Amino acid sequence: MGQKVNPVGLRVGVIRDWESRWFAEKDYATLLHEDIKIREYITARLKDSSVSKVEIERAANRVNVTIHTAKPGMVIGKGGTEVEALRKALNQLTGKRVHINILEVKKADLDAKLVAENIARQLENRVSFRRAQKQVIQRAMRAGAKGIKTQVSGRLGGADIARAESYSEGTVPLHTLRADIDYATAEADTTYGKLGVKVWIYRGEVLPSKKKASEEGGK
């Protein structure tokens, strides 16, 4: 049986950039675990703030954290109180100077992580898995997606035997490396156990030649 590689990992270095950007020789493992801790802390603390991804850059004893979120107001807080509290907590967690940038995700319906989390939350609120999937597919296509595929697996509707059901619309060319495909997973805790959610969103092709040409033209 053909297995699917993670579409994001497959495209790193081709059309996508790394989410952790730093270099280390001796402390690689320590810093990697620190990255994982930072991400886990941020996602747990901001679980209601629609956080899509967390990018980390390092320089000497300084850590730059960029949070991509659909609700920047919630992350920043009134007069920047929330983001300041988060920065202090991360300073304590890492023992380093942490600087936080916040970027807004303009189209939440085209972000696989936010779509997957949305389906998971609906499943936890006892919405039918079919309805939840069809609803996000419609919204993604309206928002300008070229294609989308969603899958929910587990004890669907409380069935005794676990299974997976998926729905798709448009095209999702997983083999085309220049295709900008966003992929993410989420989990829903229901009374019958956990349900797994997977989302693939095809947002169009990225043409590296055009990108390079525009960069050279801008110099």
Swiss-Prot record:
CDD domains: KH-II_30S_S3. Keywords: Ribonucleoprotein, Ribosomal protein, RNA-binding, rRNA-binding. Pfam families: KH_2, Ribosomal_S3_C. Residues 38-106 form the KH type-2 domain. It comes from the Bacteria. GO terms for biological process: translation. PROSITE patterns: KH_TYPE_2, RIBOSOMAL_S3. Gene3D superfamilies: 3.30.300.20, Ribosomal protein S3, C-terminal domain. GO terms for cellular component: cytosolic small ribosomal subunit. One of its GO terms (molecular function) is structural constituent of ribosome. PANTHER family: 30S/40S RIBOSOMAL PROTEIN S3, SMALL RIBOSOMAL SUBUNIT PROTEIN US3C. Binds the lower part of the 30S subunit head. Binds mRNA in the 70S ribosome, positioning it for translation. Part of the 30S ribosomal subunit. Forms a tight complex with proteins S10 and S14. Belongs to the universal ribosomal protein uS3 family. This is Small ribosomal subunit protein uS3. It comes from Bacillus cytotoxicus (strain DSM 22905 / CIP 110041 / 391-98 / NVH 391-98).
